[in-house]
């Protein structure tokens, strides 16, 4: 029987490809944002008439430098808006709409889809079982123009999630655990297929975090095999019905088992995503700023757990909290999470990448220590090259903001 990767491409191609095959594929969705869109559209212009193969399959979002913090960023947005209007693209999200990957996940991605976008964290949509893969501007421009592009079929790698999360452990810790085990390039050339033993013990928000950070693992894609959680999510969020196919497990080049109950809160210490340590190993490190958000951990459950901790008092470190989309912002507002965070002293704004890439809304200064729920912590990632970034789950981040230092979040959840 086919693996999930083989099943998807079998349906697309009419035959079962082998790992390493170079194939042309018609994508179900193509996306770009403000930081990559300028280059995508420049390439399209160089190809002659600016046109897209199917405007219903194109998603555009302003997220990286939104709202524009510089004159150049504003000029780029004007340029992209002009083309969006001329092309009559209906799925355009201007300032405040949210981060491209979250928008694709919550509004468009479906199991079995093939999704290409001009950003490395396109993998996020694998949370619902889509083959989602980041590409460069030239390849995305070709996909937009021609309605197809090439892809190298990756080798399938199986990961089994056994058991349930203990308190204070989240999808971020699973991602960091995998990075510790396999390294930052451990899944190069692989499509990681994740099977969950107890589906409802591994919610969609946590799946999205793991899929998102598969980029840091080097994976071509990471897909959670659709199950009852996938079906419920699509029905609840979009009113869309989906029935997973009845597939027997295929053949994998390798496999790995994650025992969820044995995990504890983890961090990736400076300056590498695979420099992973238990929170208890770095307890007491003083923190200047905390960032809760990004396409990795800016979802509703992330804000819920942060609010549970931050209702205890005022923050001792600067805390910037940014929901990943307008939809999440509105829900967090209605549920009172944003009220709790602002009363605790956090700065909260709408969906934008913000400080994740060191662009704006909280760039780190020289010597500053940041605890961030985002996905990268290399030198200078969030600002000054002399700053230090610890990647953590939202509970650990919120507890660090509350105490002004890295602490184990579990006592704050009792």
Swiss-Prot record:
Entry's EC annotation: 4.2.1.33
GO BP, sorted A to Z: L-leucine biosynthetic process
Cofactor(s) in the UniProt record: [4Fe-4S] cluster
Origin: domain of life: Archaea
GO molecular function per UniProt: 3-isopropylmalate dehydratase activity; 4 iron, 4 sulfur cluster binding; metal ion binding
TM region positions: none
Signal peptide from the UniProt entry: none
Keywords, in A-Z order: 4Fe-4S, Amino-acid biosynthesis, Branched-chain amino acid biosynthesis, Iron, Iron-sulfur, Leucine biosynthesis, Lyase, Metal-binding
One Pfam family matching this protein: Aconitase
Keyword Iron-sulfur on entry: yes
Residues that bind [4Fe-4S] cluster: 295, 353, 356
Pathway participation: Amino-acid biosynthesis; L-leucine biosynthesis; L-leucine from 3-methyl-2-oxobutanoate: step 2/4
Entry similarity comment: Belongs to the aconitase/IPM isomerase family. LeuC type 2 subfamily.
NCBIfam families, A to Z: hacA_fam, IPMI_arch, PRK00402.1
Biological role stated in the UniProt entry: Catalyzes the isomerization between 2-isopropylmalate and 3-isopropylmalate, via the formation of 2-isopropylmaleate.
Quaternary context: Heterodimer of LeuC and LeuD.
Name this protein carries in UniProt: 3-isopropylmalate dehydratase large subunit
Gene transcribed to yield this protein: leuC
């Amino acid at each position: 029987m086919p693996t999930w990767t083989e099943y998807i491409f079998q349906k697309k191609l009419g035959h079962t490809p082998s790992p390493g095959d170079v194939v042309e594929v018609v994508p179900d969705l193509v996306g770009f944002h403000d930081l990559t869109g300028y280059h995508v559209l420049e390439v399209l212009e160089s190809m002659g008439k600016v046109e897209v193969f199917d405007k219903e399959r194109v998603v555009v979002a302003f997220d990286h430098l939104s709202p524009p913090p510089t004159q150049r960023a504003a000029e780029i947005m004007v340029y992209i808006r002009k083309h969006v209007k001329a092309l009559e693209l209906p799925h355009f999200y201007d300032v405040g709409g949210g981060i491209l990957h979250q928008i694709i996940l919550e509004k468009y991605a479906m199991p079995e889809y093939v999704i290409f976008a001009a950003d490395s964290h396109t993998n996020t949509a694998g949370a619902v079982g889509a083959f989602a893969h980041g590409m460069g501007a030239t390849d995305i421009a070709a996909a937009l123009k021609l309605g197809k592009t090439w892809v190298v079929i990756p080798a399938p790698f199986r990961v089994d999630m056994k058991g349930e999360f203990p308190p204070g452990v989240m999808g971020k810790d699973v991602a960091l655990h995998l990075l510790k085990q396999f390294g930052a390039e451990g899944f190069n050339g692989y499509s990681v297929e994740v099977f969950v033993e107890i589906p409802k013990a591994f919610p969609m928000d946590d799946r999205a975090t793991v899929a998102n950070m598969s980029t840091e693992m080097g994976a071509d894609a990471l897909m959670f095999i659709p199950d009852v959680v996938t079906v419920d999510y699509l029905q609840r969020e979009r009113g869309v019905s989906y029935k997973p196919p009845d597939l027997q497990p295929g053949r994998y080049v390798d496999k790995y088992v994650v025992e969820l109950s044995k995990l504890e809160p983890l961090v990736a210490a400076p300056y590498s995503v695979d420099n992973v340590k238990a929170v208890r190993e770095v307890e007491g490190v003083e923190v200047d700023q905390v960032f809760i958000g990004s396409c990795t951990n800016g979802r509703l459950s992330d804000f819920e757990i942060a609010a549970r901790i931050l209702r205890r008092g005022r923050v001792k470190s600067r805390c910037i909290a940014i929901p990943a989309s307008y939809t999440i912002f509105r829900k967090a507002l209605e549920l009172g999470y944003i009220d709790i965070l602002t009363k605790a002293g956090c700065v909260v704004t709408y969906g934008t990448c913000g400080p994740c890439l060191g662009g704006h809304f909280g760039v780190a200064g020289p010597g500053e220590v940041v605890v961030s729920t985002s996905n990268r912590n290399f030198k200078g990632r969030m600002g000054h090259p002399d700053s230090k970034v610890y990647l953590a789950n939202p509970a650990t981040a919120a507890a660090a903001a509350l105490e002004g230092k890295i602490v184990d979040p579990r006592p704050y959840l009792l």
